[in-house]
């Protein structure tokens, strides 16, 4: 039986300069693809054009190259709008979408009026426009009517399992915003399927979004990839590094004369790996293989 080749990806948003947290995730995604002899893709998630910075594409490439991370193909989501439109058309033809004109304020008010409460950090949409129809004359988003039942996913790195009842814990979510921009969850699911991505290494902040992405992929006829969620890098206050929070850019280290080997060593040591003061990305490959072995990771020939 033939084993499908591993295809991994790093998918940054070009909304600013990469910081050390982005770099660590990029490193781990690259290590995973290369340690398993697979292909590695670079995909710019740039659908929200209002937040995109044109210089960030080249800066990101330079940062990755400086760290010794290569890739086999490059994509921009902004150049792939027809494939997202096709996915939306298929879901709509199946009767699984509906227009929604609710504002965030109206959604929160509806939840309060029904004596409900937000789950986690986001309110669960109560299905107002599905039940009562969209408001005429307003710009409308497009929501996916999530299927009934519970979706469970198991992380291939941590072996943790997460089960979510989508209607109760997530609610019908947006596929296309009311300004016409396709939503992250739609684009990432469509792209991973069409690009043949088998393994997704990404930050732990996306763990709770995984069940809805798996469900959406199934609705579009695609099998889910393996998901490996890695810890986020935090500052001295324990808060995650973020572009919006003013995390120092990797570019400043690169342009300031810092050695890439020292940065890679610091990233590796932040994961608890014992490495020299200077190390190359290639020299970290055995450590990632060992990490996978300890996690009981395996490749399912039938996946």
UniProtKB/Swiss-Prot annotation:
Keywords: Aminoacyl-tRNA synthetase, ATP-binding, Ligase, Metal-binding, Nucleotide-binding, Zinc. ATP binds at residue 243. Zn(2+) binds at residues 100, 102, 125, 129. A motif ('HIGH' region) lies at residues 12-22. It comes from Deinococcus geothermalis (strain DSM 11300 / CIP 105573 / AG-3a). PROSITE patterns: AA_TRNA_LIGASE_I. A motif ('KMSKS' region) lies at residues 240-244. Catalyzes the tRNA-independent activation of glutamate in presence of ATP and the subsequent transfer of glutamate onto a tRNA(Asp). Glutamate is transferred on the 2-amino-5-(4,5-dihydroxy-2-cyclopenten-1-yl) moiety of the queuosine in the wobble position of the QUC anticodon. Belongs to the class-I aminoacyl-tRNA synthetase family. GluQ subfamily. It is an enzyme of class 6 (ligase). Its EC number is 6.1.1.-. L-glutamate binds at residues 9-13, 45, 184, 202. It comes from the Bacteria. This is Glutamyl-Q tRNA(Asp) synthetase. GO terms for cellular component: cytosol. Pfam families: tRNA-synt_1c. One of its GO terms (biological process) is tRNA modification. Binds 1 zinc ion per subunit. Its cofactor is Zn(2+). Gene3D superfamilies: HUPs. GO terms for molecular function: ATP binding; glutamate-tRNA ligase activity; zinc ion binding. InterPro entries: aa-tRNA-synth_I_CS (IPR001412), Glu-Q_tRNA(Asp)_Synthase (IPR022380), Glu/Gln-tRNA-synth (IPR000924), Glu/Gln-tRNA-synth_Ib_cat-dom (IPR020058), GluQ/Sye (IPR049940), Rossmann-like_a/b/a_fold (IPR014729).
